[in-house]
Amino acid sequence: MTSLNEPNVDFHLKLNQQQFNIPSELLKRNWDKFNNLYTSYSVELQGQFATLNTLLEDPNKDEQSIEKLNDIINTVNILQKRLSQLHDNELTILERIEKRVEYFKQFERFKYDSNTDKLLKWYRSYTDLLIADYLVRHGSNSIDHKNKIASNSGIEFIKTRGLEDLIDYEVLIEANQISMELIENKNLRPLLEWIENNSAHLTEKGSHLQFQALLQEYIELVRCSDYKAAIRCFQTHLAHFANIYPKELKLAAGILAFFKSCLNNGRDDEVTNEQKLFHAYFRKQMYRPHPLSSISSSNVVHNAELCRYGPLLDHERWESLNKMFLHEFYSLYKISYHDPLLIYISLGISSLKTKDCGHTISAQLIPHENPEVNEYIKSNVVNTDCPVCNHDIFPLSENLPFAHHIQSSLFENPVMLPNGNIYDSEKLISLSRKLNKMGYTKLKENQVMDPIDKSIYATTDFIKMYPT
């Protein structure tokens, strides 16, 4: 990497603002905890001192006064311990920020001193940091039940690389855990707990997440035929949103009647039809003895009400709920919704992408009667080392712009064959000689083979091409 295209420290800071945004939010939350703790204990201590003063006025209540004084001492000790924990937590966060500032200052020094070795070492550690961020966000989680600590491959990677102070993995894995519970286990409980703990932020933003999560809880209760719990959920939680989401609540109330009408009209239908219907719409097993397992396929499929309630019963609601949660979570901590690793990869891809990328020549190859010829041409002739054309990376480049190349790579001696394909004449002749030498073909001295359609032509058939 030359000094002309070497990104400066501001470039990296802009793409890694979350390394400072997350600690900033954690400091703010720590300060809020301190204020709440101080306020609550101040009120409690004032009450205890008032009681103590009352007891001291009566000389016959010395023992009670001593007990109350001990209570005050215990309360102060508890307050001191909790304040000390918050203070230590704040120092830990500040130390992390200092180390991250120093980390990027190192890059600036290495770049200024043109120290290539140290700069490459810094980039390796930085690449590890990007990979760790991606793994923590998307890796599968496991719980150490003994210590009640969540872990995944990303955290293990962070610890082996010594990057604990450069990434707030505790925050990222919290989002990962809630997200995985939604997508894989269809479990709303962790999400609802997070919403309760962050209700002030969600209310301030006017978020729809709380309503959508409670609505999904109601729908799942109806799915399970727990009608009493569903009605209780509707009355306790959803009814408060009547003025904001009247249309959605009307549909939610109608789902209960819809299920019951299907139940009453489908008593005599065959079990196989019921299984298909519930497997398609209600996420039921193929067959379980259940009150709702007697719904009629013909009645429901032809029921116009199904069109109304379909969107609420759609399993894609879990995916949209997950996206909504991640958006709110990342917004809270000012985290980039897009993975930094993929952002950097996209930047590299966009500088390499051309209009020819993604067009696989191997799919156009016509097989030769000799399988060894096919294998050789596929591996040594049409194989490309272009990273953009890699089947794992190309999907990332589909929405990226093409690179602007000011130079073109042209064949030195371009010729066109009678079939319209254009090649470098020397490379085409060299390929034919190699195939003959390895015994794959028996071409004459003046013959060449088109590597794509395997047609054989004489060199006298070449048509000289002149790039314009």
UniProtKB/Swiss-Prot annotation:
PROSITE patterns listed in its UniProt record: CTLH (PS50897), ZF_RING_GID (PS51867)
UniProt keyword list: Cytoplasm, Metal-binding, Nucleus, Zinc, Zinc-finger
Annotated coiled-coil segments of the chain: none
Nucleotidyltransferase in keyword set: no
A GO term for molecular function: zinc ion binding
InterPro entries referenced in this protein's UniProt entry, alphabetically: CTLH/CRA (IPR024964), CTLH_C (IPR006595), Fyv10_fam (IPR045098), ZF_RING_GID (IPR044063)
Compartment annotation: Cytoplasm; Nucleus
Metal-binding listed as a keyword: yes
Transmembrane parts of this sequence: none
GO CC terms, sorted: cytoplasm; GID complex; nucleus
UniProt-listed GO biological process terms: negative regulation of gluconeogenesis; proteasome-mediated ubiquitin-dependent protein catabolic process
CTLH domain: residues covered: 171-229
Zinc finger boundaries on the chain: RING-Gid-type: 386-453
Pfam families attached to this UniProt entry: CTLH (PF10607)
Entry similarity comment: Belongs to the FYV10 family.
PANTHER family: E3 UBIQUITIN-PROTEIN TRANSFERASE MAEA, MACROPHAGE ERYTHROBLAST ATTACHER-RELATED
Function, as annotated: Involved in the proteasome-dependent degradation of fructose-1,6-bisphosphatase.
Protein name: Protein FYV10
Gene: FYV10
